[in-house]
C-alpha cells in the first residue's frame, strides 16, 4: 500500500510538471504574429490580405472593371450614372479596377495622374491585364476591396454597364442577406468548347454551376471575405462570372434572380425597371442619363430585343430558365 501511495505521488508530480511546461510554452508564445503572406500560403505571388480593421466604411462597394487605356469610358461613367446620386461614401464607394503589372512607365504615370485628379481608381499592381486573366482580375478586386474597405455588399460591374445606383441601393436594403448573391441567374448554360469563351479547364459537369451573369451582380461581405481569404485555392476559369458561381457553389448562398439586371452578354433592350443594363456605347450611356434627368425614366421608349425569364427554383438548374416571347418580364 505504501509503495502504491508513493507511486501515485510521483506520478501526480510528474503530470503537474508536464502541464506547467505545456502552459508555459503554449500560453506565452513570444514569436511574431503571422504575416498576411504567411496566412495566405506565402510566396511572392500571394495576395496580401490585411486584417479588415479601422478601414473606410460604406454600405455598397462598387468595382467597375476597366482596362488602362479606357480613359474616355471611365470619364463617361463619371459623367453619367456616377452623377445619379448625391449620397456620400458612407452609402457607396465606386472604384475603377485597373491592372498595372507589366504596364509601360508612361501608362503608369497617366493612371497615377488620373487617380490623383479623381481618386477613384483601384490600381491592382499584381495583375496583368488580358481577357484570359479576367477571372483572376475579378478575384483580385475581391481581395483589394476586402483588404482596404469595410462594406456590407459588393457590386461587380463592367465599364459598359449603366447602373441606376439609387433604386439599386433601395432594393438592396430591402433584400439584404448575409449570404446574398443577387443578379441575373443562369443554371442551364453549357460550357463553350471553342471560340472566345471556350472553357478548356471546365470538367466539373456538363453544365456550368448556377451563376449570375457578368454585366453586374451583388455579393455580400461574407462571400467576399470567403473569396478573398481563399483566393489562392481557386481554379481560374476563362469566364469570370462562371468562376464566381463555381467558387461559391458549395456554400449556403442566398441566390436572388432579378430580371431587372440586364446583364447578359448582350442587352435585352430598354426597360424602365432595369437596375443595371449592360453592353452600351458611350452615347447610349449619355442618352440614358439624360432621360433619367429629364423624365425620371431610363428609356425614351421601352423595347425588347431578346426575351427574358424568371428563374424556376422548383426545377433542376438545367430546366430553370424558359424565355417567354412577348412577356412583361423585364
Swiss-Prot record:
It catalyses: 3-O-(beta-D-galactosyl-(1->4)-beta-D-xylosyl)-L-seryl-[protein] + UDP-alpha-D-galactose = 3-O-(beta-D-galactosyl-(1->3)-beta-D-galactosyl-(1->4)-beta-D-xylosyl)-L-seryl-[protein] + UDP + H(+). Coiled coil: none annotated. InterPro entries: Glyco_trans_31 (IPR002659). GO terms for biological process: egg-laying behavior; embryo development ending in birth or egg hatching; glycosaminoglycan biosynthetic process; heparan sulfate proteoglycan biosynthetic process; morphogenesis of an epithelium; protein O-linked glycosylation; reproductive process; vulval development. Disruption phenotype: Worms are infertile because of the failure of the progeny of homozygous mutants to initiate cytokinesis and because of the failure to form an extracellular space between the egg and the eggshell. Pathway: Glycan metabolism; chondroitin sulfate biosynthesis; Glycan metabolism; heparan sulfate biosynthesis. The keyword Isomerase does not apply. Its EC number is 2.4.1.134. Keywords: Glycoprotein, Glycosyltransferase, Golgi apparatus, Manganese, Membrane, Signal-anchor, Transferase, Transmembrane, Transmembrane helix. It is found in: Golgi apparatus membrane. Residues 25-330 are lumenal. It comes from Caenorhabditis elegans. Belongs to the glycosyltransferase 31 family. Beta-1,3-galactosyltransferase that transfers galactose from UDP-galactose to substrates with a terminal beta-linked galactose residue. Required for vulval morphogenesis and zygotic cytokinesis, suggesting that glycosaminoglycans play a central role in vulval morphogenesis. This is Beta-1,3-galactosyltransferase sqv-2. GO terms for molecular function: galactosylxylosylprotein 3-beta-galactosyltransferase activity. It comes from the Eukaryota. Its cofactor is Mn(2+). Glycans are attached at residues 69, 325. PANTHER family: BETA-1,3-GALACTOSYLTRANSFERASE 6, BETA-1,3-N-ACETYLGLUCOSAMINYLTRANSFERASE. One of its GO terms (cellular component) is Golgi membrane. The chain crosses the membrane at residues 6-24. It is a single-pass type II membrane protein. Residues 1-5 are cytoplasmic.
Amino acid at each position: 500500500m505504501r509503495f502504491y501511495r508513493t507511486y501515485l505521488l510521483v506520478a501526480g508530480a510528474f503530470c503537474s510538471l508536464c502541464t506547467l511546461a505545456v502552459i508555459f510554452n503554449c500560453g506565452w508564445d513570444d514569436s511574431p504574429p503571422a504575416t498576411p503572406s504567411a496566412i495566405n500560403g506565402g510566396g511572392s505571388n500571394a495576395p496580401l490580405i490585411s486584417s479588415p480593421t479601422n478601414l473606410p466604411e460604406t454600405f455598397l462597394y462598387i468595382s467597375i472593371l476597366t482596362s488602362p487605356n479606357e480613359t474616355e469610358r471611365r470619364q463617361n461613367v463619371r459623367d453619367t450614372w456616377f452623377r445619379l446620386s448625391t449620397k456620400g461614401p458612407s452609402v457607396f464607394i465606386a472604384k475603377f479596377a485597373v491592372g498595372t503589372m507589366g504596364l509601360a512607365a508612361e501608362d503608369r504615370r497617366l493612371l497615377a495622374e488620373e487617380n490623383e485628379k479623381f481618386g477613384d481608381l483601384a490600381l491592382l499592381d499584381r495583375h496583368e491585364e488580358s481577357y484570359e486573366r479576367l477571372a483572376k482580375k475579378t478575384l483580385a478586386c475581391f481581395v483589394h476591396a476586402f483588404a482596404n474597405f469595410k462594406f456590407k455588399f459588393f457590386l461587380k460591374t463592367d465599364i459598359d454597364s449603366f447602373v441606376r445606383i439609387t433604386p439599386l441601393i433601395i432594393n438592396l436594403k430591402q433584400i439584404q442577406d448575409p449570404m446574398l448573391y443577387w443578379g441575373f441567374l443562369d443554371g442551364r448554360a453549357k460550357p463553350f468548347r471553342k471560340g472566345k469563351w471556350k472553357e478548356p479547364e471546365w470538367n466539373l459537369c456538363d453544365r456550368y454551376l448556377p451563376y449570375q451573369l457578368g454585366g453586374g451582380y451583388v455579393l455580400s461581405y461574407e462571400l467576399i471575405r470567403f473569396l478573398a481569404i481563399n483566393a489562392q485555392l481557386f481554379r481560374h476559369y476563362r469566364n469570370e462570372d462562371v468562376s464566381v458561381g463555381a467558387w461559391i457553389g458549395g456554400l449556403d448562398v442566398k441566390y436572388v434572380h432579378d430580371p431587372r439586371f440586364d446583364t447578359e452578354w448582350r442587352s435585352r433592350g430598354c426597360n424602365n425597371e432595369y437596375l443595371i443594363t449592360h453592353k452600351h456605347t458611350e452615347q447610349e450611356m449619355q442618352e440614358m442619363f439624360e432621360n433619367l434627368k429629364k423624365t425620371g425614366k431610363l428609356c425614351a421608349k421601352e423595347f425588347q430585343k431578346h426575351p427574358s425569364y424568371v428563374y424556376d427554383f422548383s426545377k433542376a438548374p438545367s430546366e430553370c430558365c424558359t424565355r417567354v416571347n412577348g412577356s412583361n418580364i423585364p
